[in-house]
């Protein structure tokens, strides 16, 4: 029951109308019995500073930050965690004792959640795409002690930046998607992670396509785990294609839930909610 004493947590981004975070976070808050609600607030670039400064002064207990503000919000935080600095992105804020914003990033822990029990130590991985999501994925794979990561992208400069930032921690190579070596890498890979938006259910994207086209995947075999960060549609065309090849598949819903659980713990000073509470709420919604 919402009352005059109810506090709130908010998602800040543009757009936010598609977000599933209010569904899963409100299920978790209800489970905990907290007098808190989770809402989504659309916010344009030029309004970000005004909105965040205003939220300090009212009953806001924390924020999620999404596109396009994950980098811009750095300038509005007085404290930034080491992982957020490494990833160059913040997705979670809370007010510290001085009533200033403290920022972190929960995407790495979200990403590795479904991989923790798969023993990927010293294994080889391919990461498709070189944008912001790829940074979280690469850091997660480093944390899981893989031996080699190959980043495949259409963007040479962003691949070079990833190698500069992460290449001292793991054997990391970058290739354009047209490189002839790609087929051998796919054949050898223990894990392929798609961080591109190809296959996502939006007005801009055709859903029944594979990242980099059908021929790119011809050497995929059944020993490879295929992890698509996209969670809508479920399963994606890539995951259906991979399952037909005999591959183990993982969709992005587990990452979404796991990073959300970490954000909730950050806001509530360590309170924990069972994974299935958020996961079931999303599955019932979808």
Curated annotation (Swiss-Prot):
Pfam families attached to this UniProt entry: SDH_C (PF18317), Shikimate_DH (PF01488), Shikimate_dh_N (PF08501)
Record: residues binding shikimate: 19-21, 66, 91, 107, 231
Pathway: Metabolic intermediate biosynthesis; chorismate biosynthesis; chorismate from D-erythrose 4-phosphate and phosphoenolpyruvate: step 4/7
Sample GO molecular function, one term: shikimate 3-dehydrogenase (NADP+) activity
GO BP annotations listed: amino acid biosynthetic process; aromatic amino acid family biosynthetic process; chorismate biosynthetic process; shikimate metabolic process
EC number: 1.1.1.25
UniProt GO cellular component terms: cytosol
InterPro entries recorded: Aminoacid_DH-like_N_sf, NAD(P)-bd_dom_sf, SDH_C, Shikimate_DH, Shikimate_DH-bd_N, Shikimate_DH_fam, Shikm_DH/Glu-tRNA_Rdtase
Catalyses which reaction(s): shikimate + NADP(+) = 3-dehydroshikimate + NADPH + H(+)
Active site: 70
Transmembrane stretches, start-end: none
Positions bound to NADP(+): 129-133, 229, 252
Keywords recorded for this protein, A-Z: Amino-acid biosynthesis, Aromatic amino acid biosynthesis, NADP, Oxidoreductase
Function: Involved in the biosynthesis of the chorismate, which leads to the biosynthesis of aromatic amino acids. Catalyzes the reversible NADPH linked reduction of 3-dehydroshikimate (DHSA) to yield shikimate (SA).
Matching PANTHER family: BIFUNCTIONAL 3-DEHYDROQUINATE DEHYDRATASE_SHIKIMATE DEHYDROGENASE, CHLOROPLASTIC, SHIKIMATE DEHYDROGENASE
Family note: Belongs to the shikimate dehydrogenase family.
HAMAP family: Shikimate_DH_AroE
Binding partners and assembly: Homodimer.
Protein's UniProt name: Shikimate dehydrogenase (NADP(+))
Organism the protein comes from: Prochlorococcus marinus (strain MIT 9215)
Name of the gene encoding the protein in the UniProt record: aroE
């Amino acid at each position: 029951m919402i009352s005059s004493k109810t506090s709130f947590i908010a998602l800040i981004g543009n757009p936010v109308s598609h977000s599933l975070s209010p569904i899963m976070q409100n299920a978790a808050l209800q489970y905990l019995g907290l007098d808190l609600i989770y809402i989504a607030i659309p916010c344009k670039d030029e309004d970000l500073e005004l909105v965040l400064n205003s939220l300090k002064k009212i009953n806001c207990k924390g924020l999620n930050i999404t596109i396009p503000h994950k980098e811009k919000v750095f300038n509005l935080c007085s404290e930034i965690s080491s992982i957020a600095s490494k990833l160059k992105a913040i997705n979670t804020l809370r007010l510290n004792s001085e009533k200033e914003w403290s920022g972190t990033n929960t995407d790495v822990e979200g990403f590795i959640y479904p991989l923790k029990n798969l023993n990927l130590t010293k294994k080889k991985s391919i990461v498709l795409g070189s944008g912001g999501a790829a940074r979280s994925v690469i850091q997660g794979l480093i944390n899981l002690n893989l031996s080699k990561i190959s980043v495949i992208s259409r963007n040479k400069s962003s691949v070079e930046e990833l190698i500069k930032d992460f290449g001292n921690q793991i054997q990391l190579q970058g290739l354009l998607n047209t490189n002839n070596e790609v087929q051998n890498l796919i054949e050898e890979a223990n894990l392929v992670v798609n961080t591109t938006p190809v296959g996502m259910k939006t007005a801009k994207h055709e859903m029944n396509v594979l990242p980099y086209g059908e021929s790119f995947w011809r050497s995929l075999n059944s020993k490879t785990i295929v992890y698509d960060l996209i969670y809508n549609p479920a399963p994606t065309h890539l995951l259906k294609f991979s399952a037909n090849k005999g591959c183990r598949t993982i969709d992005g819903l587990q990452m979404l839930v796991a990073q959300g659980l970490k954000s909730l713990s950050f806001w509530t000073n360590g309170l924990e909610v069972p994974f299935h509470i958020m996961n079931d709420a999303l599955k019932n919604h979808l």
